[in-house]
Every structure is written in C-alpha cells, then in structure tokens.
Amino acid sequence: IQHTKGGYDVVPANIMLAGAEQELSQTGKEHRLKEAVAPVAGEYDFIVIDTPPSLGVLTVNAFTCATDILIPTTAGIFATAGISQLNETVTSVQKYCNPGVKIRGILFTKFNPRANISRQIKELAEQLSEYISAPIYKTYIRAAVAVEEAQANRADIFDYAGKSTVADDYRAFIEEFLKGVYA
C-alpha cells in the first residue's frame, strides 16, 4: 500500500498481476481478493478496485469483494455493447458469490459532447441503463491528453494537471457519485 500526496492510498498493479488469472484457478478463487482486503477494509471509507476491461477471474474477484460497481465506458459501440455482457457477469456473481453487489451507475469517459456518434451512443446507453437498472451519471469525463500523460507518469490527474478541464470533470463526477452514495 502506497500513500499519496492527495491523502489516499493505492496498490498499483504491476507485471506480476498478469499471471494472477492462472494463480486464481484454485477452489474458492472468487473470494481471494475479498479475503485479502478484509484486514484493512475498516481503515477506509472507500476501496476502489480498477479492473481490466475483461470479464475474467480478476473482475469476478473484484465484484465478489465489492458492494457497488461503477461502469466506466467510452462512447463507442463495442464498449457500450460490453455493458450487457458485464451485467450478465454481475448477475452471476450476485447469484453465486455476492448477492449484495449492485451496479451503481455508468460513467462515460473520453467523451466528446460535440461528436454525433457520442450523442448517439449515449442515447443507446440510456436505453441499456434502463434494462440493467443502473443510471448514467450526468457528469462525463471529456477526452483529454492530460489523462494519458498522467497515467504514463504514474500520477493521478489532480497532481499531474489539477487545473485542467478533465480534472474538473473528475471532481464533478466525484461530487455526483458521493451525493448518490450518501443520499
């Protein structure tokens, strides 16, 4: 666990995570992350687990450990189509591993509000959000080079480009998210 200037802690992924799918092939594999997080869970208000964009063992572990799921997605047809597959995985996790987990909402990232395709995909996603009973957040994260630069520099957007419009987008999203959590 690494402490940051921003007052939060992170456990960064590394190359060792690539082999985790094979390591997690034992009995009870879906509960490994939950067991690992349990000793420190009481020390945090929130634990955010950023999973790969696949629906493998790592993601199932995260869903088994979670109380809420946030779906970040780009405004692309394939990304949006993946939401229904993700919903099927969540339904399976609810049935077999974690009945209390729920999808809290869908967040659009790398969003360009001026592009026709972005608006069309958002309309499609709104229909999908009704199907999976999860709202689309009003806040969206605009496409910005600063996000990729921050990732390349292993920094968060607030430390890397705290006055950027994309940092403002993330602040607005955090505020919207927290209002929903504490409503």
Set out the residue ranges of the language-model regions.
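C-terminal alpha-helix
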Residues: A172-A183
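C-terminal boundary of histidine-terminating zinc-finger modules
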Residues: A150-A172
